[in-house]
């Protein structure tokens, strides 16, 4: 309950500050957020033969080599072919080719407070998102 109150208070404060600064609050001006991942966050039965991780955002993104797939820990990072990361034609979905191991937990930051290269066309950085999943044995 305390966390929900803090979050609501922070949102109200942010909205008040934005309104005071004359910033229009709209889909265009607010940051993009993750709306879907493949595999889904929290999935504990991901096939180790999965060849790519996909993250879909709420808005069209800058797509020219613009992303921040970030390390949570060395133990939870998948083998990723960074030279082949790309966006789909929808300009919202970024695809990272990976090699996964069976029976392993993976955790990957999609943007962080420091690394913010996932950005929309208005240059707003995406809200950081932690993708965690586990492959089956």
Go through the PLM ranges and name each one.
Residues 1-5:
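Positively charged n-region of N-terminal signal peptides that target proteins for export
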Residues 16-19:
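Sec/Tat signal peptide C-region and signal peptidase I cleavage site
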């Amino acid at each position: 309950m305390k966390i929900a109150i803090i979050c609501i208070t922070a949102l109200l404060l942010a909205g008040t500050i934005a309104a005071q600064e004359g910033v229009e609050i709209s889909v265009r001006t607010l940051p993009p957020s993750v709306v879907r991942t493949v595999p889904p966050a929290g999935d504990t039965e991901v096939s180790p033969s999965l060849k790519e991780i996909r993250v879909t955002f709420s808005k069209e993104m800058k797509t020219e080599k613009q992303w921040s797939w970030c390390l949570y820990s060395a133990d939870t990072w998948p083998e990723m072919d960074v030279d082949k990361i790309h966006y789909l034609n929808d300009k919202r979905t970024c695809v990272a080719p990976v090699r996964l191991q069976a029976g392993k937990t993976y955790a990957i930051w999609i943007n962080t407070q420091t690394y913010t290269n996932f950005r929309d066309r208005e240059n707003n950085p995406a809200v950081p998102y932690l993708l965690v999943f586990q492959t089956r044995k």
